């Protein structure tokens, strides 16, 4: 059930109405917990009537793939609730460490099995083959549960914060279960911290705190980003990444640029709609984006892009590794290791590891650059101030090539004609000054569309639209949102692509 689908609006209308009609806070939490698991189930049960019939008849062979996904979610929740209670009752540091280790082992074990088992097996097999030790390692048919990368991180952060004594363990299992399975952020974030969300769960939400106009505006912006802009950009990006060698150099550049547009509008659009939905129910989620493509350095980019993940990696991985407390080499090791693991978190592929490594190297380079140019002249600093944003964006686009690259499959035989790494290499050459030699072209109209999107995005980053919007009376804002929604619907495709981050 995607946020841009009509059935989600019907679902949310029922959730919203019942939530605010209920008087007691406990009743509301039970209701939203049930809604969260219903929302989660909609991703795999298919036809609800047929699914219930299969359960009634015990016809397990015909059950849809992933019907057991909720069991993984419940197991993670129960595990960390027990760990939290154990940490709260323990006084000896050794015992507390054992409790924390149990949480980390369980959550990371689940993540490694479902997401990385086959990756590790195939990588080990390729490594042994490289040394001439031919093996026949077998992979398993493993289905990745939706949202497992997100809710395991949330669940782990709760146990870690309780261990660090930054958070008291929750007494009510309902509170923790609600926190982990709150449907706006369940499948693709933002990754919410227990320290910021659990206090909201304890306190009853009030309608007076809900700014309906702001929520509807934010949801509309997210809807347009995903349903209109991202879906349009995907047509160009998908066409190029499927056959990069057939396009000329300008079209190769446009193909990568439109993927940058696609992934930003897709993911930030989802985050906008998730945050808006939560706010309409009285809850606040972590902001996830702050115009990252206008960053003046890769360091600033990671303060603006996927903020909930970057801060999670900082607080629960980079700092525990030692952070910047130590030698320069020690600090750079921590940076690179954090980004490599951050890349691997996104997917079980070496292209994601390379993507993370490129960001890690760029972060190290930026620190060295700051040290070496600290005493540079005024003219040099002004020149770099002008070039900082385009150079940073160019590097980000280079990294997106490895993030997006997928293996080339023969449609007739199903054989792999080129691996993800080989495709990334071809696209990298086409995008950079090496040039491309194909004849297909997207045309100058696509370049004009990109320029218009960039201009609108820049104006929005300057809060120009926000200031004008806030001056409008409520009736005018409501009318414009209604007209805007009708116009947006005219441009939406018949069938939406799933949000990109659902696969992670």
PLM region descriptions:
Residues 1-503:
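Membrane-embedded transmembrane alpha-helical bundles that form the catalytic cores
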């Amino acid at each position: 059930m995607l946020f841009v689908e009509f059935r989600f609006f019907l679902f949310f209308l029922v959730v919203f109405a019942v939530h605010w009609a209920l008087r007691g806070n406990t009743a509301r939490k039970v209701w939203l917990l049930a809604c969260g698991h219903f929302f989660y189930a909609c991703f795999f049960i298919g036809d609800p009537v047929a699914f219930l019939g299969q359960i009634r008849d015990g016809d397990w062979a015909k059950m849809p793939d992933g019907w057991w996904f909720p069991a993984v979610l419940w197991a993670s929740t129960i595990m960390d609730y027990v760990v939290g209670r154990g940490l709260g009752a323990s006084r000896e540091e050794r015992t507390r460490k054992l409790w924390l280790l149990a949480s980390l082992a369980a959550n990371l074990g689940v993540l490694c099995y479902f997401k990385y088992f086959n990756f590790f097996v195939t990588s080990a097999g390729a490594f042994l083959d490289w040394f001439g030790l031919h093996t026949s390692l077998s992979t398993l048919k493993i289905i990745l549960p939706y949202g497992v990368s997100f809710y395991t991180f949330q669940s782990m952060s709760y146990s870690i914060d309780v261990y660090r004594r930054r958070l008291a363990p929750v007494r009510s299992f309902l509170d923790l279960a609600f926190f982990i399975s709150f449907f706006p952020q369940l499948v693709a974030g933002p990754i919410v911290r227990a320290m910021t969300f659990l206090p909201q769960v304890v306190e009853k939400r009030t309608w007076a705190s809900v700014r309906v106009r702001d929520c509807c505006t934010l949801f509309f912006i997210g809807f347009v980003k995903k349903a209109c802009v991202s879906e349009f950009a995907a047509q160009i990006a998908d066409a190029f990444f499927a056959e990069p060698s057939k396009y000329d150099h300008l079209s190769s550049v446009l193909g990568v640029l439109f993927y940058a547009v696609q992934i930003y509008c897709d993911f930030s659009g989802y985050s906008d709609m998730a945050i808006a939905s939560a706010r309409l129910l009285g809850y606040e989620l972590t902001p996830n984006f702050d115009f990252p493509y206008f960053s003046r350095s890769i360091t600033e980019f990671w303060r603006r892009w996927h903020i909930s993940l970057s801060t999670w990696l900082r607080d629960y991985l980079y700092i525990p590794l030692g952070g910047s407390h130590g030698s320069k080499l020690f600090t750079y090791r921590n940076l690179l290791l954090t980004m490599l693991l951050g890349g691997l978190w996104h997917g079980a592929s070496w292209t994601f590891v390379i993507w993370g490594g490129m960001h890690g190297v760029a972060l190290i380079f930026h620190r060295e650059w700051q040290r070496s140019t600290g005493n540079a002249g005024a003219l040099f600093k002004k020149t770099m101030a002008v070039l900082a944003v385009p150079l940073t964006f160019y590097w980000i686009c280079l990294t997106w090539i490895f993030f997006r690259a997928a293996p080339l499959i023969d449609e007739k035989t199903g054989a792999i004609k080129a691996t993800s790494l080989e495709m990334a290499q071809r696209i990298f050459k086409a995008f950079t000054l090496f040039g491309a030699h194909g004849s297909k072209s997207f045309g100058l109209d696509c370049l004009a569309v990109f320029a218009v999107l960039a201009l609108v995005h820049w104006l929005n980053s300057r809060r120009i639209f926000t200031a004008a919007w806030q001056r409008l009376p409520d009736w005018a804002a409501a009318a414009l949102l209604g007209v805007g929604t009708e116009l947006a619907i005219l441009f939406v495709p018949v069938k939406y692509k799933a949000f990109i981050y659902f696969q992670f």
